[in-house]
Amino acid sequence: IEHLKGTTEHYAYALTELHQQITPDPSKAVVTPLKTDAILALATSTMEHYSLRPSKIHGKAKATLFPTILSYMGFGGYLNPFTHEAQVNTLQPKLRIITTACHEIAHQWGIAAEDEANYFSIKATTVSDIVLVSYAGHLLAFQNLVNALYRTDADQAKAVMEKLPEGILENIREVRAFWEKYQNPFEEVFERSYDQYLKANQQQAGIKSYSLVVDLLVDDYINR
């Protein structure tokens, strides 16, 4: 748990520094004036310049035609199995669009495992020279880590959260509020179906594989 706490604090500190670079007001959430197409293009270029991109393999994210349906299903995006296009739910908060697009592009590269696609998305965005992109990546990493910390030691997780500027907390609440708005009785059915789909495609952890990115981030922190 000490490694998890240390990793969570590491990302909390980096997130706070990035927030200060974007806005001098600690109480303000980070917002972007960029339109959806520009955000998707930014995510695509972020992955294009990522050093771990497989040679001769490219990817591009595009907005799904069914964002409302995806929202009710609880999905931020998906890889179209027929066209191999990275489809992104563009109704979600813009910061999350960036990391979701990168996640789906990782699938285009051939990264099938959800935890590894999440990891590639976080690694590509956090090392970006564009502060907004780096903030989005650090925010996603932190949310995964602090959620894991809550499950193991709620008091320590709360202590980390209490040190964050109000603006970062507002960004976190924005994501939570978005998904809560679309909660419905059928969401659990969709999740169970997708869980079985993942298991049928050699991802034994099923839908829980999304959270396994925490292990990869902690390993990175230990071996940094």
Question: What name fits each language-model region?
Answer:
Residues 15, 19-26, 46-50, 90, ...:
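Sec/Tat-exported extracytoplasmic proteins
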Residues 167-224:
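Pan-zinc metallopeptidase signature
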Residues 99-118, 122-123:
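Active-site recognition of the HExxH zinc-binding catalytic motif
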Residues 19-95:
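Auxiliary, metal-adjacent structural segments of Zn-dependent hydrolase domains
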Residues 36, 90-98, 110-114, 132-135, ...:
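Solvent-exposed, acidic/flexible segments
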